[in-house]
Amino acid sequence: MSEITRRKFLHTSAAIGLSAVSYTRVAQAAVAGGRPVIGFVGCGGRSKGLLTGFRDDAIVAWACDPDKKRAESFQTASGAKQVTADLRHVLDDKTVDAIVVATPDHWHAPAAIMACDAGKHVYVEKPCSHNFREGRLLVDAARRNKVTVQHGTQSRNNRLIVNAVQMLQEGIIGDVLVCKAWNVQRRRNIGHAKPSATPAHVDYDTWVGPAEFMPYQSNRFHYDWHWWHNFGTGDIGNDGTHEIDIARWGLGVAGLPTTASAVGGKYYFDDDQQFPDSATCVFQWPGNGKVGQQKQMMFEMRIWSKNYPHNCDTGIEFYGSKGMMFVSKRGKLSVWDDSNQPIVIRSPDETPKLPKNHQVDFLEAITAGRKPAAEIGIGHDSCSLVHLANICVRTGRSLNIDPKQQTILGDTEASKMLGRPYRAEGHWSIPNA
């Protein structure tokens, strides 16, 4: 990547280093002794799921969605006072402390960046970005404005997962060197469709937002947008982000790997999906180059099967110098020694106190001025692996990466995919470096 292009992706280390962060901005409502006031941006099924965790500890002021029916339905469910299709109305409201971003992926980072610049705290669903560049810009916006941004990787507040990672860190299987994560499930065929008239209750221009404009088409709108390059990140980004995050956490790695490889394709579905229905991804971190310091992560995805490893649709195997651990957010945890004999699991003597859910962790973080469990720097590191894997699959090539410079080496096409093309005519939400 050229130096000019590289500078578009980078900011000073002080702006992005966790050690340089001071979480000093607290919610206005907290200062006044009340509950934080929040606005929901994106009012589909995911927002309704998140609402359960926010309901008792925050006041919902806004329901924002370009689908009027969804916005009004969420208003009824949440008690929100106001409805809008335009995010800017929410950000202009000085009484709002934070927003919850549960939009399609292509809106995640643009909406969150605008919120940070408006002085709002942000809970952003996974993946936090549609592409690597926007993830970097979101981290920078959070640091620059000293606001709290929580990433929607809820396992960071899951007691079983937290305990499992602590056991790994305490050496239950020795030095953790390799892990394999998976997400296997049977999704539906989205069929073949053609552009058609936009439903009257939908502000489709706002829905497309900063992305390249594509005419309305039924199988790239609600939920099915996941499977289109322009709007989603495929199932590596959709569900895979959760397993990749746990795997990275347990493996004990931060930042970018030095190599990323992935193969995948459409092996099962004959439909309009652009992302693969099957993929196998591998990432490597060199550590200090010595034996015992190098790390490897594998991730497998199949969205057409019900044959699960360990009879579990999602999970991670960790391989260490003294044994192996299997853990799943479905409530499963097993450990074996290096002779494949089961190890009796005993929870760590001292474990961190966890909030009642991931949403409350966010609210407590903004009222206390502390970091949440899935602080945006953590979220971006995990989502970066998603983006690298998708680039590998789309180009059909492995990638060599410079972690310090945050660049892909010797591959102009892949380097361009660290960002994305935007609307030719421009849009008010397009993030700028």
Each language-model region and where it sits:
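N-terminal secretory signal peptides and thylakoid transit peptides that target proteins
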Residues: M1-I16
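N-terminal Rossmann-like dinucleotide-binding module
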Residues: S13-S78, S155-N158, A247
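Short glycine-/small-residue-rich Rossmann-like dinucleotide-binding loops
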Residues: A14, T103-P104
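Conserved SAM-binding strand-loop segment of SAM-dependent methyltransferases
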Residues: Q82-D86
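Contiguous beta-strand/loop segments that form the cofactor/metal-binding neighborhood of enzyme cores
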Residues: N163, D175, K180, R186-G234, ...
